[in-house]
């Protein structure tokens, strides 16, 4: 166990410092969205409060940068360093604490798992750049950590801070608040493996009934979370939309395919912990095959085919920018008509995988909350972004069975290989646009 922890920490520290120094050496100037974020932060540091309408997220990251500027300055490297410290030090510590609280255990396996989740490739990559996602993720997880520690006030304050990084975090605040109240009540909440659809509905009704009977008891937590929710409503009334700045390219829509893309994302980055063990079990393989070839599956595939046909959205941002990996997924793969319609059959298998592993330890209420929050986070977004999947991925992993130490090490190795490759591609596989002959373009998540 000591050797495993040593390998994880040495590799983590080595790649963290290598990435920081290499990106600052080869990419010293702001790149892609950093052009807007760094310029805005540096304006704030000069006490110039003019807002760039191209920026559609709140100014939380810039305000933190202004607060820290007397100590670290406001240069490009100083601003990037803020995210690096949070991503490399803050997130592993915070995830370790959350996993310990949820599983009521400490030790090497929890540490392995914390670094495994922190090494999730898109999350790890953006720790080196000045983007809002690292701060957003940190404050949402901090709010959840406080809720698990029964501190509703601290949790609600963290939720408030998270809204200054990304507006859609209001959905996660609702999840966190309900989780807090549920952990302090006794109500009908059967294990998912033993629950029917009617039981899930009864769980929701039972929770609401007990909650309403305990309003006086929960008055302080209700006021804490309620104040944050009211501040969000006030922002909506003032701004007229959830989006700041230019709203034309960020209109809400119904994008059901997002859930399918998330499933692929989830299993691609976690297959050493779940799919390998799943496939090695004869009983689970048999159960999966019988489910896939059932009459119910025919109906599910039919719905998935309709979603693929009518709800595969080719967002202009993705098709116009060949610097992102998703450009090649949509512009090359999804343009192949038969491949688009082959996808629903893979989604069906992933749906059954997902449901089966969720039944291993999840309660009905937790499953309902996670499903609802994931849908509300992803489905309204017409733009597909790997960064949108980060919080759903982490919260689902928190509530699934803790992998073994060996499985964590395999998943960590997968992540770090991908991180090394994507860092190399970002730094050295550059190309030039004819329209900008003096600027190097780079591939990234």
Swiss-Prot record:
Gene Ontology cellular component terms for the protein in this record: endoplasmic reticulum; lumenal side of endoplasmic reticulum membrane
Bilayer topology term: Multi-pass membrane protein
EC number: 2.4.1.256
Pathway field: Protein modification; protein glycosylation
Segments forming a coiled coil: none
Keyword field contains Glycoprotein: yes
InterPro entries reported for this sequence: Alg10 (IPR016900)
EC class (word): transferase
UniProt name for this protein: Dol-P-Glc:Glc(2)Man(9)GlcNAc(2)-PP-Dol alpha-1,2-glucosyltransferase
Native organism: Schizosaccharomyces pombe (strain 972 / ATCC 24843) (Fission yeast)
């Amino acid at each position: 166990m000591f050797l495993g922890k040593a390998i994880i920490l040495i590799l983590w520290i080595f790649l963290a410092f290598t990435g920081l120094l290499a990106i600052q050496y080869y990419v010293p100037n702001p790149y892609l969205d950093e052009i807007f974020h760094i310029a805005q932060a540096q304006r704030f540091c000069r006490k110039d409060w003019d807002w760039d309408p191209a920026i559609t997220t709140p100014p939380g990251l810039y305000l933190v940068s202004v607060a820290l500027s007397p100590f670290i300055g406001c240069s490009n490297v100083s601003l990037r360093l803020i995210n690096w410290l949070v991503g490399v030090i803050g997130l592993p510590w915070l995830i370790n604490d959350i996993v310990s609280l949820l599983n009521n255990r400490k030790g090497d396996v929890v540490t392995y798992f914390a670094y495994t989740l922190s090494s999730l490739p898109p999350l790890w990559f953006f720790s080196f750049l000045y983007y809002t996602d690292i701060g957003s993720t940190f404050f949402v997880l901090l709010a959840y950590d406080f809720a698990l520690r029964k501190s509703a006030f601290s949790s609600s304050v963290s939720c408030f801070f998270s809204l200054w990084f990304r507006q859609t975090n209001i959905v996660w605040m609702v999840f966190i608040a309900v989780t807090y109240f549920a952990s302090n009540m006794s109500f009908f909440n059967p294990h998912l493996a033993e629950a029917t659809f009617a039981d899930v509905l009864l769980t929701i009704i039972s929770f609401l009934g007990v909650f309403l009977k305990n309003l006086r008891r929960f008055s302080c937590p209700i006021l804490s979370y309620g104040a944050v929710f009211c501040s969000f409503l006030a922002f909506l009334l003032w701004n007229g939309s959830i989006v700041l700045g230019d709203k034309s390219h960020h209109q809400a829509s119904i994008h059901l395919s997002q859930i399918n893309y998330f499933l692929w994302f989830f299993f691609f980055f976690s297959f050493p912990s779940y799919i390998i063990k799943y496939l090695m079990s004869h009983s689970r393989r048999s159960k999966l095959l019988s489910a896939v070839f059932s009459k119910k599956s025919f109906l599910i595939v039919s719905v998935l085919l309709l979603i693929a046909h009518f709800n595969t959205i080719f967002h202009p941002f993705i098709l116009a920018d060949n610097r992102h990996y998703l450009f090649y997924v949509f512009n090359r793969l999804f343009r192949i008509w038969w491949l688009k319609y082959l996808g629903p059959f893979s989604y069906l298998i992933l749906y059954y995988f997902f449901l089966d592993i969720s039944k291993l330890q999840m309660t009905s209420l937790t499953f309902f909350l996670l499903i609802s929050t994931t849908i509300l986070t992803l489905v309204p977004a017409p733009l597909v972004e790997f960064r949108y999947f980060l919080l759903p991925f982490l919260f689902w992993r928190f509530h699934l069975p803790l992998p073994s130490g060996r499985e964590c090490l395999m998943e960590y190795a997968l992540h770090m290989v991908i991180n090394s490759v994507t860092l190399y591609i970002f730094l050295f596989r550059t190309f030039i646009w004819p329209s900008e002959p003096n600027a190097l373009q780079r591939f990234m998540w």
